[in-house]
């Protein structure tokens, strides 16, 4: 992928909360050095990850970029970070005021018939793409505008975990769905994860 405004925005929006969380853990890391190395790894990881379209064409680019950011911090910590610490870092980042506000702002438009049609159109375009980093999904319309089902058959975060040799961390990234849907006023019923 190219390093675009999406990647810059994600770094500004969620990296500070991640580093604040890690600083509070008192694990003896030099947070300043960790930030610098993480940013370098982040840029490298972005450049070696296949493009899935712009943030406007494919909103899931934000999810993929978030995954890249968190895995880059994990790698910068020389993989000495425990899975529990990684999970806490991801959660703390997602709970940053900017992220919560962004998802709550979508609450009025996320569960409408127009949003369902848009998701279905995006899903059909993604399904045609053979890129393993693309989310392939099937949208099933519900009884009304507020209810729908999305069945994912392929996940960009799973592909990212495999690419970086860190598939064991992908389930912690799946928690993002539950938090974000909750902030938009919905309820997510996950029957399984692809990871």
Each PLM stretch: what is its role?
Residues 139-194:
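Short, hydrophobic/π-rich interface segment
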Residues 28-30, 82-84, 167, 187:
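Short coil/loop linkers at secondary-structure junctions
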Residues 65-163:
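Amphipathic interaction/junction segments at domain boundaries or subunit interfaces
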Residues 11, 46, 50, 54, ...:
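Residue-level signal for well-ordered alpha-helical segments
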Residues 3, 34, 135-139, 188-191:
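Generic structural motif
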Residues 1-74:
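N-terminal, charged low-complexity regulatory/assembly segments
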Residues 36, 88-90, 173, 193:
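Proline- and acidic/polar-enriched loop/turn elements at helix boundaries
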């Amino acid at each position: 992928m190219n390093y675009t405004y999406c990647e810059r925005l994600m770094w500004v929006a969620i990296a500070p909360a991640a580093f604040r969380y890690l600083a509070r853990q008192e694990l003896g890391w030099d947070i300043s050095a960790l930030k610098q190395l993480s940013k370098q790894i982040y840029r490298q990881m972005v450049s070696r990850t296949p493009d899935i379209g712009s943030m406007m064409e494919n909103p899931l680019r934000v999810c993929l970029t978030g995954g890249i950011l968190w895995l880059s911090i994990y790698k910068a910590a020389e993989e000495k970070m425990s899975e529990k610490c990684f999970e806490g870092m991801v959660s703390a980042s997602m709970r940053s005021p900017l992220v919560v506000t962004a998802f709550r702002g979508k609450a009025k438009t996320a569960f409408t018939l127009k949003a369902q049609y848009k998701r279905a159109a995006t899903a059909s375009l993604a399904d045609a793409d053979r890129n393993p980093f693309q989310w392939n999904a099937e949208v099933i319309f519900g009884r009304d505008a507020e209810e729908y089902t999305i069945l994912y058959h392929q996940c960009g975060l799973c592909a990212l975990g495999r690419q970086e040799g860190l598939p064991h961390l992908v389930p912690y990234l799946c928690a993002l769905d539950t938090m974000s849907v909750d902030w938009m006023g919905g309820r997510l019923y996950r029957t399984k994860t692809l990871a």
